[in-house]
């Protein structure tokens, strides 16, 4: 739900974007907007020096990134893997170790402001990972984020996102209590 709008912003800023989605309708829409649809994640990995992952759940990130057909195994040495999904701290650290073994940069970069923020191009990014690799990404990230923070080592982004979510849900509960 968020990956499509994020890819759309990249396309509008004239980036060449390769993508893979299990939903044929989303793939058709991506192609209609100028994206190149790949048959699988391995094909995306072989085409791009920067790969952005935006899937819904922790296990989906692992499915896309790990294993023989995953991004980590198929990306070229020196490439950057950017994970924008919200996931477990332990999982992002495990993926970082796998990426480092393959000579990749892994940037932990969960985003806030939901689908509306992705559509508007005003996401908040709570990034972490190699500082130089992160800074090289800024022109890409600015296409769909208005607020971009680097918070330290891989995992710090996920911790900050969980803190953000806790504060959000505290506010929701407080409003429900207040207004009944």
Tell what function each PLM region has:
Residues 41-106:
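Rossmann-fold NAD(P) dinucleotide-binding segment
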Residues 7-8, 31, 63-66, 93-96, ...:
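Short amphipathic alpha-helical segments
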Residues 173-174:
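Glycine/proline-rich active-site loop of Rossmann-fold NAD(P)-dependent oxidoreductases
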Residues 86-169:
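Rossmann-fold dinucleotide-binding core
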Residues 1-53, 79:
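NAD(P)+-binding Rossmann beta1-loop-alpha1 motif at the extreme N-terminus of oxidoreductases
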Residues 23, 43, 58, 112, ...:
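Residue-level "edge-of-site" marker
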């Amino acid at each position: 739900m968020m990956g499509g709008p994020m890819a759309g912003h990249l396309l509008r800023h004239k980036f060449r974007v390769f993508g893979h989605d299990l939903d044929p309708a989303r793939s058709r829409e991506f192609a209609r907007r100028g994206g190149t649809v790949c048959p699988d994640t391995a094909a995306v990995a072989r085409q791009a020096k920067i790969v952005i992952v935006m899937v819904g759940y922790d296990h989906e990130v692992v499915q896309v990134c790990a294993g023989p057909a995953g991004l980590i195994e198929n990306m070229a040495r020196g490439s950057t893997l950017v994970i924008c999904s919200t996931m477990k701290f332990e999982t992002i650290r495990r993926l970082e170790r796998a990426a480092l073994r393959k000579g990749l940069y892994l940037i932990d970069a969960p985003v806030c402001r939901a689908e509306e923020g992705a559509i508007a191009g005003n996401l908040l990014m709570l990034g972490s990972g190699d500082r130089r690799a992160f800074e090289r990404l800024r022109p890409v990230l600015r296409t769909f984020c208005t607020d971009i923070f680097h918070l330290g080592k891989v995992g710090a982004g996920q911790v900050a996102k969980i803190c953000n979510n806790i504060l959000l849900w505290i506010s929701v509960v407080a409003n429900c209590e207040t207004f009944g």
